[in-house]
Structure formats: C-alpha cells, structure tokens
C-alpha cells in the first residue's frame, strides 16, 4: 500500500462525513473542502512531526515502534468520531455546531446526573470507551499495510529536512485553524466543524447590511438620548422572564388547574393587569430575550442595539441581571446585556445550586443592596422552572408523584416526552409561580416594590405533544403564546390589553416612566390604544420559517409560512385556537395580504 493511499482514504471518509452533515443539517457545501483541508493539514503535520521524531531517534540509536503512525491515525479517527457525535447531538438539539465552550459549561452538570439528560455518566463512558475500542480493533485488524506504508516513508527521513517540514506543517495547520476560528462570517468556515469547536463563546447575530444600518442608527441614538427628561419618574423596573412558559397552562389565563395561585391573586386584587393574547417574537430563548430587551424583530438586532437597559442607564439606573441557566454559554448573551462587572449573576456562578435551579436567583438577590432614594434599579430575572432542563424541587410534585422522576440513561428515546408530559409541566408552572412569589418577597423586603413596575412574561412556549415536543422549531400557539402580566405600584391604567408581543414590553416600560421611546424600536406602548397591527414572528433553529399575526380589533389571524419549502398555513385564532383548520385555500385574499408581510430575514 502506498502511503498516499492511506492519507487519501482518510480524507475521503472525512469528506463523506462532512457531506453528510451538509446534506442532513444544511451546514452548506462550502464547509466540506474547508473541513477536508483542516483534517488533511493535521494529517501532514502529524506525519511531519513523526518524521522528525523518527530522525532524531535514529541519531540516538533508538527505533520507534513500527505501529506508531497507526496508533496516531487511530487516535485521530477516535477524536473525529467524538467530534462528529457531539455535533450530531448539538444539531439535533439546537441546530448549531458544538463548541468547546459549551462542552466545558455543561459537562459537569451532565456528568453529575443532577439534571436530566438522555445519556447519563454510564452511557457517556460506554459510548466513549466503546468507540475507542471499535476503532482500535479496526486498526489492529487491518492496520499492518498502514505500518508498511508509513515505515517506507519514514525510513527515508533526514533530520534537517524532517525538522523543517515539521515546523512548516505545524505552522501551516495553526494558521489555517486560526483563519477558520476567526471565519465566523465566512461561508467556507462558519460551519466547519473543527474550527467552530475552538471558537470562543458563540454569538448568534449573523452580520447583514440591515443589522449594520440599524446599529449605526442606534449609535446616534445612544449618544443623543437625553439623560434628563422633565416629568419622568424614577420607578424601579423589574422584568421577569420565565423560560418555556405558555399561557394556556396558567390558572391566571383560565387553565382549570390551580397552577398560578400567587399571580392569580395579584390579578384578582387588581394590582396586576394581564394582556389577553400575548405572543413571543420567536420560539427560542435567544431571540425571545433579545427582542424583549431591544423592542426589535430578531433580524434587526445586533450587539450594538440600543436596548431598554441602555436607556435606563442613561437615566442613572443600576442594572442587575439575576439569571437561572448558564447565559454565558449561549451565544454570548452577556455581551448583548452590556452588564457591568458584578451586576450579572447566572448559573455558572452559583455556589449552592446547579445552573438550572431557580433558587440561585434568590442567592443572587442576596447580593443586591436595599433600595435607596435617588438610585433607581432595573432587574432582569430569568427563571428556568418550566424549561424541561429546569430543576424540579422535591416539594413541587403536586400533579405528579414524588417518585415520578426522569433518570438519565433510562429512556434516551422518550426523554423529552417524559420531561414535558403535561402533569410534570403543570408542576413546574406552579413551581415558577412560587419562585415569582419569593422574588416579590425579597424585592419587597428591600423596598424595591414600593414604587415599581414589574413585567412577568415568557421567552417562548413549549410543545407538550400536541404536534411536537419542546420548542424552537415551530410557531403554533403552544410555541409562542405566552403570558404578559403588568404589576404597578401605584396602579396604572392600560386602555387596551387585548393584544401584545415581546417588542411592546420595552416601549410600555419607558412610557410608564415618562421617557421618550427610541424611534428605532418596533413595538408599541400598551398605554396607548391600538386596533390594527401586523406583527412578525420567526423560528430560530429553522431560519426561514415565519409567522405574521394580524390583529384588527377583535379579529386575530395567524399566517405561518416556510417560503423555502412552499408551506403556508392560515388560522383564525379566535375561532380555532388549536390551529386545526388551515384557511389558506378558503380565504385567499387574506392569505395574500399576510403573505406580503412575511419577512425573508436580513
């Protein structure tokens, strides 16, 4: 066997796997040659370094084992198998390449078994060890021709030439990898598996001319927004976002089970208002959170967006971010928050709880000093109770048995069904309501609620088996119909609470404070009546699936389109809240009108 055949065979397998990723996950064919280039340069660097080591050993009278290159190639293939497997998991789960940052962030939690995951420690060890043994067995059985081919090539190595080649090949590989790591915006590199694995924490705003234009306009707004506004109020502002919280499983929205006793008591007493039909702009956390803070559709958001907390800082507010979950691991969210040192506390910093345990928010609140006159504060509180990864407390088994738990590794193919079954979800809605009560209690004890406005909402909904499980892929009501609750001390009057979306939250808060709403914000204040609107919604994992909600007084329609595949659905949400009757063929004029409002993205 000639040695070039060994290398070409390895690269052929690599190219085939890269092509499979491009075909199955839409990662783009341009990433195939980039991936083959990285692996090929690694093979050459490995061979060149081994040649240099062989030449040095020969000078010293030492002979390396003839199977050395076979072992190194087997190790390379094993690492590739691990990388490909991690990326299959990540693409199936959240349609993104796996990164070392994510592995380091979530490995301790998964390994500990303290949070549910389809495969527990035993499964991880079994897969890792089994993969290694299988590859070792293959190379042991059919590796002798590789030894002969490598031996004939390595035997001709000369020290000076081998050393120079080793240095050159290592430098070339490092330079290529550096280009790949920095090529986040390149069609050839952004989906390449090796370089994307070593990128620093991700950031999910794809650059576009539209985003650059909005960012440039926001830079002017940031510089010119008034620091002092006559007649404005320095009320404390609290934004509570509960992950994966859908309105139709909340008692306060008419659900038959008592899942929200605290929130219901506030609404019943008149201290809290609710928007009847509220929707998230997106069915995934990243775009839901960023749209809420920036009052923008996702396609208009960038790291430089002028956001709610930026406006409030101009007014002298201290901004606090108390966040269940590991926000540092997901798409560079802290960069978007513009949080100053010490003001952001998330699951990666807790000393008492795992990263998806909402009790860590109370731990973070302990760090917040009591309110003082003339020092208004903004709080963004994120709770994970209703997310399928959110920790369920032992005392939170009301609609399920206390022994009805999900053990890692037991049922890998039904893990989402078991985590998301309605009884368990209702338990966790009740738990979230209890956590909100505790947040209110702590804020009240520190006098932040003496003069405050509080918003309680969800970042998106959650599929519970109606059509699918979990979130991120669809735009039906179970995916994007969320609560939107407003608590005011003293009370405020809202003339129209029939309809609202994420993008309305920030304008409403500024209007409540008597502050001007930036002209680039896309939402509407709920303090001002509105009868006719078109609102944009989209998925994050499937970037070309959109929805338009059309509200005209009491009428409410939803148009869902995936233009790339020609799929369209139209629903009358007043008559058909379960979205079972597609009206596209029955109401072509309305479908045509809403089709014109479908956004194709940046």
Short names for language-model regions:
Residues 1-190:
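Transmembrane and membrane-interface helices of multi-pass
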Residues 168-240, 244-408, 513, 526:
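Active-site-proximal alpha/beta segments of enzymes that process anionic O-linked groups
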Residues 197-199, 204, 219-228, 362-370, ...:
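A long, amphipathic alpha-helix that forms part
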Residues 243, 292, 312, 365, ...:
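Generic structural signal for small/hydrophobic residues in well-ordered secondary structure
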Residues 258, 444-491, 535-541:
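Histidine-centered active-site microenvironments of extracellular/periplasmic hydrolases
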Residues 462-466, 511-569, 573:
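C-terminal cap/loop subdomain of S1 sulfatases and analogous C-terminal strand-loop tails that border
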């Amino acid at each position: 066997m000639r040695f070039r055949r060994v290398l070409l065979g390895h690269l052929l397998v690599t190219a085939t796997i890269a092509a499979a990723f491009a075909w199955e996950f839409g990662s783009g064919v341009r990433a195939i040659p980039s991936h083959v280039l990285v692996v090929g340069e690694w093979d050459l660097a490995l061979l060149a370094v081994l040649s240099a080591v062989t030449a040095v050993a020969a000078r010293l009278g030492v002979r390396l084992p003839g199977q050395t290159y076979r072992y190194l190639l087997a190790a390379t293939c094993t690492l590739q198998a691990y990388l490909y497997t991690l990326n299959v998991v990540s693409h199936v789960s959240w349609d993104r390449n796996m990164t070392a940052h994510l592995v380091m962030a979530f490995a301790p939690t998964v390994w500990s078994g303290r949070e549910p995951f389809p495969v527990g420690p035993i499964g991880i060890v079994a897969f890792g060890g089994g993969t290694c043994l299988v590859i070792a067995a293959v190379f042991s059985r059919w590796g002798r021709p590789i030894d002969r081919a490598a031996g004939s090539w390595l035997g001709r190595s000369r020290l000076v030439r081998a050393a120079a080649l080793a240095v050159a090949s290592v430098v070339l590989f490092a330079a290529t990898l550096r280009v790949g790591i920095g090529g986040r915006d390149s069609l050839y590199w952004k989906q390449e598996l090796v370089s994307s694995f070593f990128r620093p924490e991700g950031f999910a705003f794809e650059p576009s001319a539209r985003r650059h234009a909005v960012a440039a306009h926001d830079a002017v707004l940031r510089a010119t927004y008034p620091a002092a506004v006559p007649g404005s109020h320095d009320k404390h502002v609290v934004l509570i976002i509960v992950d994966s919280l859908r309105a139709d499983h909340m008692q306060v929205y008419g659900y038959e089970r008592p899942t929200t006793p605290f929130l219901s008591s506030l609404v019943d007493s008149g201290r809290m208002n609710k928007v009847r039909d509220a929707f998230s702009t997106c069915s995934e956390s990243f775009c839901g959170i960023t749209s809420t803070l920036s009052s923008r559709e996702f396609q208009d958001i960038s790291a430089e967006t002028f956001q709610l907390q930026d406006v409030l800082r101009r007014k002298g507010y201290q901004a606090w971010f108390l966040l269940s979950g590991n926000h540092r691991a997901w798409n560079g969210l802290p960069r978007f928050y513009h949080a100053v040192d010490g003001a952001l506390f998330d699951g990666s910093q807790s000393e008492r709880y795992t990263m998806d345990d909402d009790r860590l928010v109370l731990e973070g609140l302990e760090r917040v000093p009591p309110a003082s006159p003339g020092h208004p504060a903004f709080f963004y509180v994120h709770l994970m109770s209703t997310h399928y990864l959110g920790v369920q407390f032992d005392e939170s088994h009301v609609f399920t048995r206390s022994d009805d738990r999900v053990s890692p590794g037991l049922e890998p193919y039904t893990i989402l069904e078991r985590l998301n079954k309605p009884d368990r979800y209702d338990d966790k809605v009740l738990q979230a309501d209890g956590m909100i009560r505790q947040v209110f209690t702590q804020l009240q004890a520190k006098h932040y609620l003496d003069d405050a406005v509080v918003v309680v909402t969800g970042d998106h909904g959650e599929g519970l088996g109606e059509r699918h499980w979990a979130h991120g892929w669809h735009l039906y009501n179970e995916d994007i119909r969320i609560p939107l609750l407003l608590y005011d001390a003293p009370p405020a009057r809202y003339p129209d609470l029939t309809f609202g979306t994420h993008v309305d939250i920030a304008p409403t808060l500024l209007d409540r404070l008597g502050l001007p709403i930036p002209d680039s914000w896309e939402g509407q204040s709920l303090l001002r009546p509105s009868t006719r609107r078109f609102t944009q919604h989209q998925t994050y994992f499937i970037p070309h699936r959109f929805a338009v909600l059309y509200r005209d007084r009491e009428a409410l329609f939803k148009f869902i389109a995936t233009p790339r595949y020609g799929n369209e659905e139209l629903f009358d949400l007043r008559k058909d809240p379960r979205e079972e009757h597609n009206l596209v063929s029955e109401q072509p004029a309305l479908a045509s009108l809403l089709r014109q409002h479908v956004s194709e993205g940046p």
